[in-house]
Swiss-Prot record:
Its main location: membrane. It is found in: Cell membrane. The keyword Lipoprotein applies. It comes from the Bacteria. PROSITE patterns: PROKAR_LIPOPROTEIN. Encoded by the cryptic lambdoid prophage DLP12. This is Prophage lipoprotein Bor homolog. The lineage of its organism: Bacteria, Pseudomonadati, Pseudomonadota, Gammaproteobacteria, Enterobacterales. The gene is borD.
């Protein structure tokens, strides 16, 4: 039982969250994202592509300040539980004020 608990704790410790931020303009941005979209990938997203039209969300490309993609702890946990079959990823779009 101790070995199983130790293996589970070790697996949770070595998994991590990932976040990529792309700053488009150096303008004042809203604190909260204009829109948060969850993309549903399968088999770690191999051969899959999802896009977000940030210009459409912000009402024009000149209003886009930054975009982020993030694999949260919960997303990583879902991927771990399903052995990588289901691997969600969140995308956020920030617009100028």
């Amino acid at each position: 039982m101790k070995k199983m608990l130790l293996a589970t704790a070790l697996a949770l410790l070595i998994t991590g969250c990932a976040q990529q931020t792309f700053t488009v303009q150096n303008k004042q941005t809203a604190v909260a994202p204009k829109e948060t979209i969850t993309h549903h990938f399968f088999v770690s997203g191999i051969g899959q592509k999802k896009t977000v039209d940030a210009a459409k969300i912000c009402g024009g490309a000149e209003n886009v300040v930054k975009t982020e993609t993030q694999q949260t702890f919960v997303n990583g946990l879902l991927g771990f539980i399903t052995l990588g079959i289901y691997t969600p990823l969140e995308a956020r779009v920030y617009c100028s004020k």
